[in-house]
A protein has these predicted regions:
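Extracytoplasmic/periplasmic, Sec-exported soluble proteins
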Residues: 9, 13-16, 38, 47, ...
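Mature extracellular/periplasmic domains of secretome proteins
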Residues: 1-2, 13-31, 40-57, 68-98
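Short acidic, glycine-rich surface-loop motifs adjacent to enzyme active sites
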Residues: 1-13, 34, 145
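Hydrolase catalytic cores
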Residues: 45, 100-159
């Protein structure tokens, strides 16, 4: 499940949205969620869920050399607020980063503001552009091995 949404506040992963993500994970659904575009050291809900695959964005600096890729200036980064469970690993967010800057994407003939777009595409940046890339990778992993559990899918995406 790919989600490009979130709250505007920092979360410790115990809020209701985060708990729903954890329940989906327990039901066998990998949940990939955008980290947000405030450029802040915060992790909003539902990306803050213990079992979310929280996605940050990288900027390729307009070249193909991967050695100079940086966390995009707009991408939120963690760690998440401590939830008091003595597990420091679940505070580490984002879970993964992916290209999110200057992504060419399909667009309708009118944008959110009602402006005309005759080309049918747009160039966008944000963690919401990085998230579907990670979701696509997760789908390929699940296609290759349908027995993967969400945790294994998360590890596969990281590798």
């Amino acid at each position: 499940m790919s989600m490009s949404l979130g709250t505007t506040s920092d979360s410790d992963g115990t809020d209701s949205q985060s708990q729903l993500v954890n329940q989906a994970n327990a039901a066998g659904i990998a949940v990939i969620i955008a980290m947000g575009n405030d450029g802040d050291e915060e992790v909003p809900s539902p990306a803050a869920a213990d079992w979310s695959i929280a996605v940050g964005a990288i900027d390729n600096n307009d070249n193909v050399n991967r050695n100079d890729d940086d966390l995009a200036s707009y991408s939120n980064y963690g760690p998440r607020q401590d939830d008091g469970d003595n597990d420091r690993w679940d505070e580490l967010k984002p879970s993964v980063v992916a290209p999110g800057s200057n992504i060419r994407a399909a667009a309708g003939h009118a944008n959110f503001f009602g402006d005309s777009n005759a080309q049918g595409w747009s160039t966008l940046s944000g963690t919401s552009m990085a998230t579907p890339i990670v979701a696509g990778l997760a789908a390929l992993l699940l296609e290759a091995d349908g027995s993967l559990k969400p945790t294994s899918t998360t590890n596969g995406v990281r590798d």
